[in-house]
Amino acid sequence: MQIILLDKVLNVGGLGDIVKVKDGYARNFLIPTGRARRATAANKAEFEAKRVELEKAAAAKLAESQAQGEKLGGTTVKLTQKAGVDGRLFGSVTNGDIAEELGKQGYKVAKSQVRLPNGPIKVVGDSTVSVALHTDVVVDITVTVYGETA
């Protein structure tokens, strides 16, 4: 299906690009989330009329993400979980736990923005985690997990 992208989409294209994607991806994800529209003549004309406005909004969103990224960069998140004697956790630390703790520290981060490269953290110690604030802004933070013996 031919679509017009209304936002930058990772591995697909940028604002204003007319691209061909699988029908299901367009119908079930891109169009309902407002990231794209079908590439009809009417939608192309409407997009060109709103292009400047959309580019300003995208630039503002990028600037906001970069400002938040500068504040967030180098942040350390400290979490305490129950752990065994050998340092393995009973359970794990997930992206939701990290996003919740960042929220307590005053940062607005969704759990989908927290990227755990090796899956959930299951051991006590320091781990480096990426936070994708925007498709162009990815910040690394340190997560320190302390063990609490039961």
Curated annotation (Swiss-Prot):
Keyword field: Ribonucleoprotein, Ribosomal protein, RNA-binding, rRNA-binding
Molecular function via GO: rRNA binding; structural constituent of ribosome
Cited InterPro entries: Ribosomal_bL9, Ribosomal_bL9/RNase_H1_N, Ribosomal_bL9_bac/chp, Ribosomal_bL9_C, Ribosomal_bL9_C_sf, Ribosomal_bL9_N, Ribosomal_bL9_N_sf
Pfam families in UniProt: Ribosomal_L9_C, Ribosomal_L9_N
One Gene Ontology cellular component: ribonucleoprotein complex
GO BP terms in the entry: translation
Matching SUPFAM superfamilies: L9 N-domain-like, Ribosomal protein L9 C-domain
Role played: Binds to the 23S rRNA.
Family recorded in the similarity comment: Belongs to the bacterial ribosomal protein bL9 family.
Full protein name: Large ribosomal subunit protein bL9
Lineage: Bacteria, Pseudomonadati, Pseudomonadota, Betaproteobacteria, Burkholderiales
